[in-house]
């Protein structure tokens, strides 16, 4: 299907619908990377050149041949200590203390279906949708093996990579660095696209030329972080949204990560993505195996929009799982900005009644329903219902709300513990703290040691008792601080704790998914601080940002869209003046922006005017009409909100049968000029009727002539145009 081994050339070729990836086992057993790009045929080893380079070491096997050096050859798994002085994929500390490895080809296996990773999220596929290539490399001196895993999904133009490290030696070793994916390019004038940010302003696009030296992103916070998203794009110099070559790497992992792009002395480029090497030293006893997380790769020569669509399809259909993989999500209202910690069962019931009258599907009770939790200084870890505060049982409240025809959800933060809590008084050792040091607090809370099974078991027992005794249909899983004081009392090997913590998190989430298959879980870490493909394996949507300001959200959701589908972006209409920025935007505009996400409300419904309530009912009706298209259609960025006074995007049906064009005017001026937006992805030969005016346009006209936008008075106006093919 998609993987071919040629014995004559000793090449492995991975073919997708539009791309080719090729590597070769050379005469010394090194696995060299030959090519990744637009589909091509034949052996590509002619691209390799060999010259005598000063100060470049030569493998002993090469004898007197000074033209052969790992320092200039493209590789699939570069190793520290074998003559390659660039940043390496693999760094091992051997039993004798030496820091070197020299991986040579041993064998391979090709099989139908997609590999999985024990304890880790990974792309999944049916046997007829994917193939797996396993290549085993071995260090002849130690017997340590590296198994390289390649998953090929031909129809999606997706290739996945991962690696196992198996200690087949007789001594304990340490994995000090392991990158899950490496791409080496022999030439090219590239730009690096990364997505930086901060709390409440995540995933801002940065595009910089790849210069000599290393450019690095990463996180040491224990999460993928608000500061850098674990995704990188390498683009040819002139690549645009619609034209040009570009490569993506997206990490299917939610903890510390490291992404690096470097240009070497010979103008070659290396791209690496994997677990953060800082504070990482993973022990492997004889016979043990370390499993590295997965990286999703994609390439296209058709610009950034197509690259994003490849990733969107992969995440929607081969990362997200369960009932809500394809099902439209409920429209919900979250109690946080309506009540914060100040509520009773009766106030929540009244909010649910108002929600029902407006057509909202679900009420979500946010922070404050458990333990002694009237502010953010106490109660975390005590996951029992505060019935005194509610004035009734949670099960009773949920039943009353359900009787209105409204579903019910709750907020949880299972990874955290307050020092003022029953759990901390009983199990202070469950918190991540360093003996002899006072802990670093953040939001007045500490982090539980999820690297320990008994801690995960204890918290899961509490949470499941709540879920078992009330009809909870949604959970918002929050995580409101970074990891510090990382020390586990259960091991002397502290270099493994950060990684094992994430495995504990995944174990907890996997138990929830299996025990409650119809439960919708929304991920959150102070908004978008853990927005990655790893979390999406368990939570099909993630709260995009704690910043719900509609204009800031244009930029946040724009950056997020490069790697993640609209169906994954938690987005709500919130009150004005906005609680994060103080900005006032029209209710209609807030609705249009939130519809390019999971859509819901984050405000006090009881304070809305009758006119606003009518607008909310209208928004919900429009969303229900567009929801299948929004959730499953092809997303196109039409403008850059950082550079244009207009932010425009569209979603096109997979059969080009309909399109929803969305526009927000970011700036207004006196004597306004008219802006035009050119649509993308339509059938040029087809006719499309705009559903509000009834006017008919050709697909070619909309794509090449464009659509004139109103030049109206008023700040931050928004427009939606729904076109249906005749």
Summary of predicted features, one role per range:
Residues 588-637:
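Catalytic cores of secreted or luminal carbohydrate-active enzymes
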Residues 18, 163, 287, 333, ...:
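Conserved, mostly hydrophobic/aromatic
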Residues 391-393, 426-427, 431-586, 598, ...:
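Active-site neighborhood of glycoside hydrolase catalytic domains
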Residues 241, 640-683:
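Carbohydrate-binding surface patches
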Residues 5, 9-14, 21, 31-262, ...:
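Polysaccharide-binding surfaces and accessory modules of carbohydrate-active proteins
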Residues 699-726:
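C-terminal beta-strand-rich structural cap/linker in extracellular carbohydrate-active enzymes
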Residues 324-461, 474:
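Aromatic-lined carbohydrate-binding/catalytic grooves of carbohydrate-active enzymes
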Residues 98-105, 282-301, 717-723:
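Short Pro-Gly-centered flexible turn/kink motifs
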């Amino acid at each position: 299907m998609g993987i071919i081994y040629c014995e004559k050339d000793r090449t492995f070729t991975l073919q997708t619908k539009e791309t080719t990836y090729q590597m070769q086992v050379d005469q010394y057993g090194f696995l060299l990377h030959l090519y990744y790009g637009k589909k091509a045929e034949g052996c590509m080893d002619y691209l390799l050149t060999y010259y005598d380079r000063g100060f470049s070491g030569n493998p002993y096997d090469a004898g007197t041949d000074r033209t052969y050096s790992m320092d200039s050859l493209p590789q699939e798994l570069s190793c520290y200590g074998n003559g390659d002085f660039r940043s390496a994929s693999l760094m091992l500390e051997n039993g004798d203390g030496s820091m070197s490895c020299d991986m040579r080809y041993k064998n391979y296996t090709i099989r139908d279906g997609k590999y999985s990773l024990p304890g880790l999220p990974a792309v999944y596929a049916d046997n007829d949708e994917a193939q797996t290539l396993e290549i085993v490399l071995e260090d002849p001196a130690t017997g340590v093996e590296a198994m390289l895993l390649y998953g090929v999904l031909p129809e999606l133009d997706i290739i996945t990579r991962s690696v196992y490290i198996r200690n087949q030696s007789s001594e304990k070793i340490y994995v000090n660095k392991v990158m899950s994916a490496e791409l080496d390019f022999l030439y090219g004038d590239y730009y690096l696209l990364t997505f930086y940010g901060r709390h409440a302003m995540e995933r801002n696009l940065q595009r910089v030329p790849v210069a000599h030296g290393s450019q690095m992103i990463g996180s040491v916070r224990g999460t993928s972080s608000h500061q850098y998203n674990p995704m990188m794009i390498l683009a040819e110099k002139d690549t645009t949204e619609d034209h040009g070559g570009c490569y993506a790497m997206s990490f299917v992992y939610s903890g510390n990560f490291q992404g690096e792009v470097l240009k070497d002395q010979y103008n070659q480029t290396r791209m690496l993505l994997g677990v953060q090497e800082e504070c990482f030293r993973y022990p492997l006893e004889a016979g043990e195996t370390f499993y590295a997380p997965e990286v999703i790769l994609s390439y296209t020569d058709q610009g950034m929009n197509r690259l994003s669509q490849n990733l969107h399809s992969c995440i929607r259909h081969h990362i997200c799982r369960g009932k809500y993989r394809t099902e439209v999500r409920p429209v919900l209202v979250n109690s946080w900005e309506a009540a914060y910690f100040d509520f009773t069962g009766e106030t929540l019931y009244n909010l649910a009644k108002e929600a029902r009258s407006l057509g909202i599907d679900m009420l979500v009770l946010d922070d404050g329903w458990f333990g002694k939790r009237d502010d953010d200084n106490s109660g975390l870890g005590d996951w029992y219902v505060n019935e005194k505060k509610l004035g009734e049982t949670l099960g009773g409240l949920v039943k009353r709300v359900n009787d209105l025809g409204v579903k019910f959800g709750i907020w949880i933060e299972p990874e955290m513990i307050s020092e003022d809590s029953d759990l901390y008084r009983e199990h202070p050792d469950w918190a991540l703290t360093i003996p002899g040091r006072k802990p670093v607090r953040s939001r007045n809370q500490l982090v539980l040691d999820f690297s320990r099974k008994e801690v995960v078991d204890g918290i899961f027992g509490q949470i499941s008792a709540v879920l078992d005794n009330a009809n909870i249909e949604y959970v918002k899983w929050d995580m409101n601080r970074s990891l510090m004081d990382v020390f586990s009392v259960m091991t002397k090997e502290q270099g493994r704790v950060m990684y094992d913590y994430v495995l504990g998190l995944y174990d907890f989430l996997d138990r929830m998914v299996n025990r409650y298959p119809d439960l919708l879980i929304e991920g959150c870490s102070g908004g978008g601080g853990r927005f990655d493909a790893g979390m999406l394996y368990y939570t099909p949507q993630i709260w995009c940002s704690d910043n719900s300001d509609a204009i800031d959200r244009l930029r946040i959701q724009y950056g997020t869209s490069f790697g993640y589908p609209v169906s994954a972006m938690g987005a709500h209409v919130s009150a004005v003046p906005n609680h994060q920025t103080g900005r006032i935007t029209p209710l209609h505009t807030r609705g249009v922006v939130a519809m390019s996400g999971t859509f819901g409300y984050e405000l006090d419904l009881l304070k809305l005017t009758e006119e606003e309530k009518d607008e909310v009912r209208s928004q919900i009706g429009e969303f229900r009409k567009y929801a299948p298209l929004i959730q499953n259609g092809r997303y196109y960025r039409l403008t850059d909100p950082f550079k244009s006074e207009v932010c425009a995007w569209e979603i096109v049906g997979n059969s080009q049968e309909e399109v929803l064009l969305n526009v927000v005017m970011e700036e207004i001026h006196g004597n306004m000029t008219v802006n035009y937006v050119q649509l993308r992805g339509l059938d040029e030969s087809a006719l499309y009727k705009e559903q509000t005016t009834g006017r008919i346009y050709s697909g070619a006209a909309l794509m090449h002539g464009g659509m004139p936008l109103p030049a109206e008075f008023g700040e931050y106006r928004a427009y939606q145009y729904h076109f249906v093919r005749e």
